Structures are given as C-alpha cells and as structure tokens.
C-alpha cells in the first residue's frame, strides 16, 4: 500500500520546488487508507514537507551511504543499467518497496525513513538531470524554474 501511493532540487536537480510539486501531485492522489498509514509514520507533516528531506540529510554521516542513490544510469538503448557498487535510485526504490511490503512488522523509524526515501527518489526519477546516460555526452541542458539545472556528469 505504501509503495503504491508514491509510485502514482539543487543545482543538479529539482530543488525544493520540483520535489514539492511532485509530492503535492502524489498527495492529491492518496487514498484515504494510505494517507492514514503515512500520517502514522510521518506525524503532523504531509509528504510535501518531507519531499526534499533526503537532499538535506545525505551529507550527514548517518545518511552518507545514500549519496549515490539520487541518480540512475541507462545504456545507449535507454535500458536501466544498475550500479550495484554504490547503489542508485532504482535499486533504493526497489529495496524500500520490498521493505515496506511488511511495514506492520518493522520498527516505526524504519518505515518512516523508507517512506521518505520513496518520496524523494521517485521525485528524482522524474527529473531528467538525475539520469546518467552511459556513452553519451552529459552536456545537455534542462531548463527549470527560469534557470538551467545540470545533468549528472559521472557515476
């Protein structure tokens, strides 16, 4: 249930505006039952509030492992190319979805952080600058919010 609700930032990505926009669309489409479950784990804040959370915490020692999770690679045929050494957005999304299938048997803190991961990473995957195109020049420009955001240069 939690994974389904989410599947419906900065110079290198959406920033707050883009993440909050995507989260607001998800929030507007939540089923009441999903909203109730999410509120149990996120408290008084909506999913929009936590949309950029992962960008704000990835530089802390506790969440440093998530630094490379914000992008995904595709090959010359635009087929997803996993990055198992450090992880990536797709593998992190899949792991969070698998964990949350058993959310009722997980510690509340584990459920909350995985909801936040999904909120953020699904938003990242809707930003062209968060996709690394193997074998291609990464110098394309993506205009957002009146300025250009830079694509991922390497992974």
Task: Give residue ranges: language-model regions.
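N-terminal signal peptide c-region/cleavage motif recognized by signal peptidases
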Residues: 8-10
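N-terminal, motif-rich segments that launch catalysis or mediate targeting to/interaction with membranes
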Residues: 12-121, 128-155
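Sec-dependent signal peptide recognition
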Residues: 1-3
